[in-house]
């Protein structure tokens, strides 16, 4: 596995972990909205930015694949969560498309982080 492929795999795992911490919260569906948060919501864009920045530093070529891998991991984990929750009660996640819109908006700073890493590389040259 090359360094680039390893970074993509780590980016997918980061997306899965972001979903576990901010959406699943290690709680059943009925307790997620009323329970305490593991981290406050404003940490999600910050963590996405940092992950996009750190994982795309040193990658040659197009850096957009790192944030896309983060987003893909986040989407995949949330889709699995929706399927698991709806297996017990089909009325859970009635507004599931909006969950994906929120995920895309909240993790979009990963693209900014990848762009900043490109600017840092240009500045060093």
Question: Can you name each region flagged by the protein language model?
Answer:
Residues 13, 24, 39-47:
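Short hydrophobic alpha-helical membrane-embedded segments
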Residues 4-22:
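Alpha-helical transmembrane segments
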Residues 24-27, 67-70, 93:
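Alpha-helical transmembrane segments of multi-pass membrane proteins
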Residues 27-41, 77-102:
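Interfacial non-cytosolic loop connecting adjacent transmembrane helices
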Residues 91-125:
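Alpha-helical membrane-associated segments of multi-pass integral membrane proteins
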Residues 63-76:
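Central hydrophobic cores of alpha-helical transmembrane segments
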Residues 44-64:
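Canonical alpha-helical transmembrane segments
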Residues 5, 54-61, 116, 120:
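Structural signal for the C-terminal ends of transmembrane alpha-helices
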């Amino acid at each position: 596995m090359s360094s680039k492929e390893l970074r993509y795999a780590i980016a997918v795992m980061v997306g899965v972990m972001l979903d576990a911490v901010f959406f699943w919260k290690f709680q059943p569906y009925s307790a997620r909205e009323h329970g305490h948060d593991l981290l406050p919501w404003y940490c999600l864009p910050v963590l996405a930015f940092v992950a996009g920045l750190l994982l795309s530093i040193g990658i040659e070529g197009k850096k957009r694949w790192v944030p896309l891998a983060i987003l893909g991991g986040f989407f995949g984990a949330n889709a699995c969560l929706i399927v698991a929750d709806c297996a017990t009660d089909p009325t859970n996640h009635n507004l599931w498309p909006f969950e994906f819109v929120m995920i895309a908006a909240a993790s979009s700073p990963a693209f900014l982080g990848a762009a900043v890493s490109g600017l840092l590389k240009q500045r060093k040259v």
